Amino acid sequence: MVQRSKSSANWLREHFNDPFVKQAQKDGYRSRASYKLLEIQEKDRLIRPGMSVIDLGAAPGGWSQVTSRLIGGQGRLIASDILEMDSIPDVTFIQGDFTQDEVLQQILDAVGDSHVDLVISDMAPNMSGTPEVDMPRAMFLCELALDLATRVLKPGGDFLIKIFQGEGFDMYLKDVRTKFDKVQMRKPSSSRDRSREQYLLGKGFKGA
């Protein structure tokens, strides 16, 4: 029998005792992350019926489930992740590594000649536990997501992204502020207290 590490056992215990995990199972959401987006939605009303949205780092689909329900049948949702994701009705899913040009091009092709109202990203790299390694990886994903957002957002569009406090954060925040009318930070109650993750919200894209 494989022996689990102490940290792995602690994670499993925390996971199964987590009220948001239990609530997600009850409500039919694929992950506890759904409640992070729902809480931000409650405060900021980002997602509205009929919107066009891109969801990065979508698997297993918690944010896509919430977004699809809120935009309704007249909306359009393009989701992408390096991992597989079970299909969701009316959601276009692109599987692949977002850091690769061909995957970016697939997303751009799916958007087509139109633009989108909102880009959301819950992407995070596989964490090693070493900040000197993890932060550059995380910030690289954030930079790529912002680059995509500036290509596909309509003027006035919004951008929501998971970000971690650490090296590169201040410069990134400064960059986002040059591109959006209003920038705010959000820390949903469903985000674990010990997690360094926050969500950066850029509202009112100024245009490319």
UniProtKB/Swiss-Prot annotation:
GO terms for molecular function: rRNA (uridine-2'-O-)-methyltransferase activity. Its EC number is 2.1.1.166. S-adenosyl-L-methionine binds at G61, W63, D81, D97, D122. Its main location: cytoplasm. GO terms for cellular component: cytoplasm. SUPFAM superfamilies: S-adenosyl-L-methionine-dependent methyltransferases. It is an enzyme of class 2 (transferase). The keyword Repeat does not apply. It catalyses: uridine(2552) in 23S rRNA + S-adenosyl-L-methionine = 2'-O-methyluridine(2552) in 23S rRNA + S-adenosyl-L-homocysteine + H(+). The active site is at K162. The keyword rRNA processing applies. InterPro entries: RNA_methyltr_RlmE, RNA_MeTrfase_FtsJ_dom, rRNA-MeTfrase_E, SAM-dependent_MTases_sf. Belongs to the class I-like SAM-binding methyltransferase superfamily. RNA methyltransferase RlmE family. PANTHER family: RIBOSOMAL RNA METHYLTRANSFERASE, RRNA METHYLTRANSFERASE 2, MITOCHONDRIAL. Specifically methylates the uridine in position 2552 of 23S rRNA at the 2'-O position of the ribose in the fully assembled 50S ribosomal subunit. NCBIfam families: PRK11188.1. This is Ribosomal RNA large subunit methyltransferase E. The lineage of its organism: Bacteria, Pseudomonadati, Pseudomonadota, Gammaproteobacteria, Pseudomonadales.
